[in-house]
A protein has these predicted regions:
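Sec-dependent signal peptide recognition
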Residues: 1-9
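Hydrophobic h-region of N-terminal signal peptides that target proteins for export
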Residues: 9-17
Length: 238
């Protein structure tokens, strides 16, 4: 888990508060590439090969890291997440990977090892976060649609709920910039293990604060799906 923990730590642009109960700005933008794998081992091998290439090393220098996540509770099997400090770094990395042979071979290899007709991607911003991701090895991911006119209200209500809970693991709210017609955001909660993650979720859902939160946001927030997310492998700058 050490490489995953280092990857997660590298994603945090702003230093975390000593108070793990405080919600802070995330300060990061990223790409989410969703796939339905036919051969997960081939997908990992193709990523290893790309990252080891000269082009991959240059791409990695522009990014905060790349991680492959496994999904349970979704029609897709995995997603890649690549994080960046800002849109300028993202643009430079995209231009680099799309103009080198190793990058094009990587895309082809991922296509060969997955069901290409199911692929989709989104760009998202880590708008808010609480806690230290490096202590987490599994996550619950809540795909949401929030009324555009109420998104500020939702962020405020979500922050209040998260800060009221004394559960293990991190929390975050990601705002989709593209691909947001059906899912405008996702929220996540992390934990050190599946039992602790589920126990924390049960504790939150049975709390007075959650009942108040649900009543407040019910008219403008829809939960589209809930998934469990497990890091498979991360590729980070040495």
């Amino acid at each position: 888990m050490r490489i995953i923990n280092l990857f997660i730590l590298s994603f945090i642009l702003l230093p975390l508060s000593a108070d793990d109960h405080k919600v802070m700005p995330g300060g990061e933008v990223g790409e989410f590439h969703y796939i339905k794998a036919k051969n997960p081992l081939a997908i990992v091998a193709a990523t290893d090969k790309f990252i080891a290439s000269d082009c991959g090393q240059k791409w990695q220098a522009k990014s905060r890291g790349l991680v492959l996540m496994q999904l349970d509770g979704s029609g897709m099997s995995h997603f890649f997440y690549s994080g960046f400090d800002d849109y300028e770094s993202m643009n430079e990395a995209i231009q680099l990977a799309s103009s080198c042979a190793a990058g094009l071979e990587f895309v082809q290899a991922i296509g060969d090892a997955s069901h290409g007709e199911y692929y989709f991607n989104r760009i998202g911003e880590l708008s808010l976060q609480k806690g230290d991701w490096t202590k987490d090895s599994v996550f619950l991911k809540y795909d949401l649609f929030v009324d555009p006119m109420k998104r500020g209200d939702y962020a405020k209500a979500w922050s209040s709920l998260v800060e009221s809970q004394d559960t293990p693991g991190s929390s975050g709210l990601v705002t989709h910039v593209t691909g947001n017609g059906r899912v405008s955001h996702f929220a996540f909660n992390g934990g050190p293990s599946v039992p602790e993650l589920m126990s924390g979720a049960e504790e939150t859902f049975s709390s007075k604060e959650f009942l108040e939160f649900a009543a407040e946001v019910d008219e403008y927030r829809t939960v589209v799906n809930v998934m469990m997310v497990t890091p498979v492998k991360a590729w980070v700058k040495e």
